[in-house]
Swiss-Prot record:
Pfam families: ROK. Pathway: Amino-sugar metabolism; N-acetylneuraminate degradation; D-fructose 6-phosphate from N-acetylneuraminate: step 2/5. Belongs to the ROK (NagC/XylR) family. NanK subfamily. ATP binds at residues 5-12, 132-139. This is N-acetylmannosamine kinase. One of its GO terms (molecular function) is ATP binding. The gene is nanK. Keywords: ATP-binding, Carbohydrate metabolism, Kinase, Metal-binding, Nucleotide-binding, Transferase, Zinc. It catalyses: an N-acyl-D-mannosamine + ATP = an N-acyl-D-mannosamine 6-phosphate + ADP + H(+). Catalyzes the phosphorylation of N-acetylmannosamine (ManNAc) to ManNAc-6-P. Homodimer.
Length: 291
C-alpha cells in the first residue's frame, strides 16, 4: 500500500509517495504560506497533493504544532504565519478522499530515526532545530505523544528566564533563542534582518557576531540535552532540522555538552533521514496504524 506523506513545517510544505518498502518517490515542495487564513494553507496543500493523490491509498501528515483530534493547534503561531488552528485530517480527507492520519512532525521524525538506529536501543530523543525547536521521545520502544499531543515539545522548556518572549507566550524558551527564527531575531547592526541561513554563511566567513549567535544557540541546545538526559535517561539524542544539520553545528553542541557533568552526557547523532524523517515517520506510523 502506498502512502501519500505530507510534512507541514514553518518554512516549507513537502509531500511524497512512500511504499511499503519505505522508499520515497516523487518528492515535491512548496513554501509554507505566511498567512493567518486557513484558506491559504488549504490551497497550498491542494496544489501540493493533487499530482500525487491518485497514486496513493492513504494519507499521513506530519505537521508542526500540537496535533489533537486530527487538528493542528499552533503552540507558536508565528511558525505558521499566525495561523492558530487548522483541521488537518478533515481537510486532507476532503481533498483526497483517502483515509488520513496526522501527527506532530517531530514525533513522526523521532519514530523514523528510531527505526534507523543500530544496536539495542529502546530509549531515544529526537530534536529538530529549524524554524522552531521540536522533539520526539521514544521510551521503552514506544513513541510518546501524550493524551493531548503535547509530548516532546521540548523547545518550549526554559532556557533563560530573562530571555526573549516566545511565540507560545512563555519567556526565554529554548525555541526563542536556539531556533533559526531565534538566531535571526537576535541579530543586530549589519546582520539585522538576516535569516539564519545568511547568518551561518557569514559565520563561515568569520563574522564575529554571526559566530556568537550560533554559539549561543548551540550552548542553549546542549543545556537542553543535559536536561533531557536527566529527565529521560535516554541512550542517545538524534539532532535534525535545517539548523541542527548545518555544517559544524552539531560539533559545537557536542563541545558545550562535554562541559556539563559526566552524568548528563549522552551520545549525539545527526539525523539519518536528514530532511525526510517527518515524511517517512508519518508513513511508518500509518502503516502500523499506531495512532
Amino acid at each position: 500500500m502506498t502512502t501519500l506523506a505530507i510534512d507541514i513545517g514553518g518554512t516549507k510544505l513537502a509531500a511524497a509517495l512512500i511504499g511499503a518498502d519505505g522508499q520515497i518517490r516523487d518528492r515535491r515542495e512548496l513554501p509554507t504560506p505566511a498567512s493567518q487564513t486557513p484558506e491559504a494553507l488549504r490551497d497550498a496543500l491542494s496544489a501540493l497533493v493533487s499530482p500525487l493523490q491518485a497514486h496513493a491509498q492513504r494519507v499521513a501528515i506530519a505537521s508542526t504544532g500540537i496535533i489533537r483530534d486530527g487538528s493542528l493547534l499552533a503552540l507558536n503561531p508565528h511558525n505558521l504565519g499566525g495561523l492558530l488552528h487548522f483541521p488537518l485530517v478533515k481537510t486532507l480527507g476532503q481533498l483526497t478522499d483517502l483515509p488520513t492520519i496526522a501527527i506532530n512532525d517531530a514525533q513522526a521524525a523521532a519514530w523514523a530515526e528510531y527505526q534507523a538506529l543500530e544496536g539495542d536501543i529502546t530509549d531515544m530523543v529526537f530534536i529538530t532545530v529549524s524554524t522552531g525547536v521540536g522533539g520526539g521521545v521514544v521510551s521503552g520502544g514506544k513513541l510518546l505523544t501524550g493524551p493531548g499531543g503535547l509530548a516532546g515539545h521540548i523547545g518550549h522548556t526554559l532556557a533563560d528566564p530573562h530571555g526573549p518572549v516566545c511565540g507560545c507566550g512563555r519567556t526565554g524558551c529554548v525555541e526563542a533563542i536556539a531556533s533559526g527564527r531565534g538566531i535571526a531575531a537576535a541579530a543586530q547592526g549589519e546582520l539585522a534582518g538576516a535569516d539564519a541561513k545568511t547568518i551561518f554563511m557569514r559565520a563561515g566567513q568569520g563574522d564575529e557576531q554571526a559566530q556568537q549567535l550560533i554559539h549561543r544557540s548551540a550552548h542553549v541546545l546542549a543545556r537542553l540535552i543535559a536536561d533531557i538526559k536527566a529527565t529521560t535517561d535516554c541512550q542517545c539524542v538524534v539532532v535534525g532540522g535545517s539548523v541542527g544539520l548545518a555544517e559544524g553545528y552539531l560539533a559545537l553542541v557536542e563541545t558545550y555538552l562535554a562541559q556539563e557533568p559526566a552524568a548528563f552526557h549522552v551520545d549525539l547523532l545527526a539525523a539519518h533521514y536528514r530532511h525526510d524523517a517527518g515524511l517517512l515517520g508519518a508513513a511508518l506510523l500509518a502503516q502500523g496504524e499506531k495512532l
